Amino acid sequence: MDTMGRHVISELWGCDTNKLNNMEFIEQVFVNAALRAGAEVREVAFHKFAPQGVSGVVIISESHLTIHSFPEHGYASIDVYTCGPVIDPNVAAEFIARELNATTSEVLELPRGMGPVKPEKRLSHSAVK
């Protein structure tokens, strides 16, 4: 069965703390990562937190790239999700890891839209009151 998309989740450790706290740098890296992967950038939104950290999203025609950075830990959580068979999300994720000088990169790729989740893998959450 064909997928509706590929979702790369990347845990980046040992990143350059100054880069992780530089919103303009991260924004440019993410736009460049999308373009290198062959994606079409639609919108860009990033936010710098006080005293540190950056979160942001690059919306692409094919889906999105996101980051949440934790400079105090040298850590960044990134997602690259692409719809369709043309764009390889790993190209963007690897570029981001290199630009942030990550010493460790743990990557998980999930095919999306493959049908119902198997019961043993489904998580149930009750409503919070």
UniProtKB/Swiss-Prot annotation:
The record marks E62, S63 as: Cleavage (non-hydrolytic). Is synthesized initially as an inactive proenzyme. Formation of the active enzyme involves a self-maturation process in which the active site pyruvoyl group is generated from an internal serine residue via an autocatalytic post-translational modification. Two non-identical subunits are generated from the proenzyme in this reaction, and the pyruvate is formed at the N-terminus of the alpha chain, which is derived from the carboxyl end of the proenzyme. Binds 1 pyruvoyl group covalently per subunit. The active site is at S63, H68, C83. One of its GO terms (molecular function) is adenosylmethionine decarboxylase activity. Its cofactor is pyruvate. One of its GO terms (biological process) is spermidine biosynthetic process. Coiled coil: none annotated. Keywords: Autocatalytic cleavage, Decarboxylase, Lyase, Polyamine biosynthesis, Pyruvate, S-adenosyl-L-methionine, Schiff base, Spermidine biosynthesis, Zymogen. Its EC number is 4.1.1.50. The modification Pyruvic acid (Ser) is found at S63. It comes from the Bacteria. Pathway: Amine and polyamine biosynthesis; S-adenosylmethioninamine biosynthesis; S-adenosylmethioninamine from S-adenosyl-L-methionine: step 1/1. It catalyses: S-adenosyl-L-methionine + H(+) = S-adenosyl 3-(methylsulfanyl)propylamine + CO2. One of its GO terms (cellular component) is cytosol. Belongs to the prokaryotic AdoMetDC family. Type 1 subfamily. Catalyzes the decarboxylation of S-adenosylmethionine to S-adenosylmethioninamine (dcAdoMet), the propylamine donor required for the synthesis of the polyamines spermine and spermidine from the diamine putrescine. Heterotetramer of two alpha and two beta chains arranged as a dimer of alpha/beta heterodimers. This is S-adenosylmethionine decarboxylase proenzyme. The lineage of its organism: Bacteria, Bacillati, Bacillota, Bacilli, Bacillales. The gene is speH.
